[in-house]
Design a protein with these regions (language model features):
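Helix-to-loop junction immediately C-terminal to a conserved catalytic motif
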Residues: 48
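Catalytic Walker B motif of ABC-type/P-loop ATPase nucleotide-binding domains
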Residues: 158-161
């Protein structure tokens, strides 16, 4: 379980998070929605201890994440970055196994290649691409390789940062369903940030709306369309006017 209590973060005089309270149950898939600049990415970085927060606490399985110097702290996480973030200079198999070749779970190169082949199959790709380089793959294939890398270390928690950005609607739907299948099959906790409401409906068990530095609403995905929250209604329906219109 991940628990955030009163988390605040500012950059200079600019307040980004003004008191975030959030609970994410183990094995659940939470999608955080909200307009650009509301602090979604900053919040993820705070959970990952990549950004120091000013006030509040964040506990991951009852351990405060300020204990990031623990050598195994980052081993429990997987991450799918917005742009994929593959390394152009190394082949696909090494991209997938990158952390396992260097980190606390260090494995041999032959084992890493075998693991990469297995993870590729989980994301619907043939293992015959393992010796290719990212530039030789389509955007959709690159995204699936990045997803294979995110699950390579069998993480307990996976973060997805705008997973369908830059993809056509068909490939976006493929990625959404792959994410959902993997989250369910692996039994991991998933946290996704996205503007894509279609992605939200496929991936989420729970949804949190972040605005003005706080969680304005949190509920089950089947309550999203009847949340009773005007900010949520405005955002998911793309309305030009409403309680958040003056904040752009």
């Amino acid at each position: 379980m991940i628990v955030l209590e009163g988390v605040k973060k500012s950059f200079g005089k600019k307040k980004i998070l003004t008191g975030v309270n959030l609970k994410i149950n183990e094995g659940s898939s939470l999608v955080i929605i909200g307009r650009s600049g509301t602090g979604k990415s900053v919040l993820i970085k705070c959970i990952l201890a990549l950004e120091n927060y000013d006030e509040g606490t964040i506990h991951i399985n009852k351990i405060e994440n300020s204990n990031k110097n623990n050598k195994t702290f980052y081993d429990q996480f997987g991450m799918l970055f917005q742009g994929g973030a593959l390394f152009d200079s190394i082949p696909i198999w090494e991209n997938i196994s990158f952390r396992l070749l260097r980190g606390n779970q260090k494995i041999s190169r032959s084992d890493a290649k075998q693991l990469a082949s297995e993870k590729l199959k989980l994301v619907g790709l043939n293992s015959d691409i393992i010796d290719l380089y990212p530039s030789e793959l389509s955007g959709g294939m690159q995204k699936r390789v990045a997803l294979a890398r995110a699950i390579a270390g069998d993480p307990k928690v996976i973060f997805f940062d705008e997973p369908t950005t830059g993809l056509d609607p068909i490939m976006a739907n493929v990625i959404n369903r792959l994410i959902r299948e993997i989250v369910v099959e692996m039994g991991v906790t998933a946290i996704t940030i996205t503007h894509d409401i279609n992605s939200t409906r496929i991936i989420a068990d729970d949804v949190a709306m972040l605005d003005s530095g706080k969680v304005q609403w949190k509920g089950k995905i089947n309550h999203l369309d009847n949340s009773g929250n005007k900010m949520v209604d405005q955002f998911i329906n793309g309305l030009a006017t409403g309680p958040i219109s003056n904040n752009y």
